[in-house]
């Protein structure tokens, strides 16, 4: 082995340092690249003249991390790691192996107009992807580990399909983006701070979706037990299918789409200017809307029973939903518009307003309760 601790090593010599598994010893790799100690003190500006280096085999790895403008493609067709970058930038690029995770970064205090493209051979053990600081990862193979975690932040983006027999975790924040699909036993999806995710989700057991701070989620979700929390101006446009559903919407957040609850009860809570606008079908409904929140349920599905609380300037509207029995409480300048075929029990304060339709029996009658014409 050449005296790599004293002089720079050419790309061909770097390739020879790889063992049969594609791994480089940490100390040798640092010295060979002379990169960990080689840090650009001033601004590193890309020249626009692109060169490509072969960094040898990747070996088996469980995670991959992209940061600082790295554009990484995980390809089943690739045999070795291929790196393309500006000719004055490529010597400041670093690949570290940390506990089975490949970490790509650039050793510079600041950068300008750099372009780094990396192709990495796929690993069957890959189960963790992270991207931040405008980094990108495009994984062209499904992530099939026993559990899978994907994290995207700071304008990063990840494109990947998750197909695991275990748990899946997705965390997208700070203008990060995720596109792909999720299949798992139990899923936890958190989208926040202007992040966005477009992914059909199918969980055999439970799924929890949390969307906040002007973030966005779109596509279909199927789960046995589904919890959805939307807050702080966030929005969800989706078709939700579950055996049991709990949904909370507040702080001017929005949901639009379709909700189907196959077996047990759907629980909807909307407050603080939040809104639910969608088609609903299910056997039982429990809804609470307050503080100028809005629930507008479309469709004429058959519902056995519904318990609804409307307060503080809120609005509940389900004029076509075919509910057999209603238990309705409306107060403090709130409004409700419902359809009922059986028993309609109403508790309405003097400042509230209720309109109804259907061949129902109304248990409470007052001036602020009126049949629709």
Map each language-model feature to its residues.
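Histidine/lysine/aspartate-rich catalytic loop segments that bind and position anionic ligands
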Residues: 274, 293-300
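Short, small-residue-enriched loops and turns at beta-alpha junctions
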Residues: 236, 276, 316
């Amino acid at each position: 082995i050449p005296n790599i601790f004293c002089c720079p090593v050419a790309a061909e010599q770097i390739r020879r340092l790889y063992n049969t598994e594609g791994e480089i010893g940490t100390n040798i790799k640092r010295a060979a690249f002379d990169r960990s100690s080689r840090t650009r003190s001033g601004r590193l500006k890309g020249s626009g003249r692109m060169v490509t280096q072969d960094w040898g085999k990747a070996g088996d790895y469980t995670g991959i991390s992209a940061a600082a403008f790295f554009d990484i493609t995980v390809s089943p067709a690739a045999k070795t790691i291929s790196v393309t970058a500006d000719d004055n930038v490529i010597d400041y690029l670093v690949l570290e192996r940390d506990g089975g995770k490949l970490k790509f970064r650039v050793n510079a205090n600041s950068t300008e107009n750099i372009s780094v493209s990396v192709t990495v051979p796929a690993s069957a053990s890959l189960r963790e992807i992270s991207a931040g600081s405008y980094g990108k990862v495009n994984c062209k193979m499904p992530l099939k580990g026993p559990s899978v975690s994907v994290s995207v932040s700071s304008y990063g983006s990840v494109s990947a399909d998750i197909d695991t027999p275990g748990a899946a975790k997705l965390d997208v924040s700070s203008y990060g983006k995720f596109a792909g699909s999720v299949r798992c036993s139990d899923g936890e999806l958190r989208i926040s701070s202007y992040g966005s995710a477009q992914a059909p989700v199918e969980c055999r057991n439970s799924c929890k979706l949390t969307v906040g701070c002007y973030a966005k989620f779109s596509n279909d979700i199927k789960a046995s037990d589904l919890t959805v929390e939307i807050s702080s101006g966030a929005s969800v446009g989706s078709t939700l299918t579950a055996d049991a559903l709990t949904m909370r919407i507040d702080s001017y957040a929005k949901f639009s789409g379709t909700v189907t609850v196959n077996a047990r009860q759907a629980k909807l809570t909307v407050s603080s200017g939040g809104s639910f606008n969608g088609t609903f079908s299910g056997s039982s409904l429990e809804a609470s809307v307050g503080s100028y929140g809005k629930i507008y349920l479309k469709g004429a599905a058959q519902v056995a029973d519904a318990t609804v609380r409307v307060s503080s300037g809120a609005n509940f509207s389900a004029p076509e939903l075919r509910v057999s029995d209603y238990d309705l409480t409306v107060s403090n300048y709130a409004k409700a518009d419902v359809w009922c075929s059986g028993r309609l029990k109403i508790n309405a304060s003097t400042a509230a307003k209720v309109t109804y339709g259907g061949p129902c029996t109304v248990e409470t009658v007052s001036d602020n309760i009126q049949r629709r014409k």
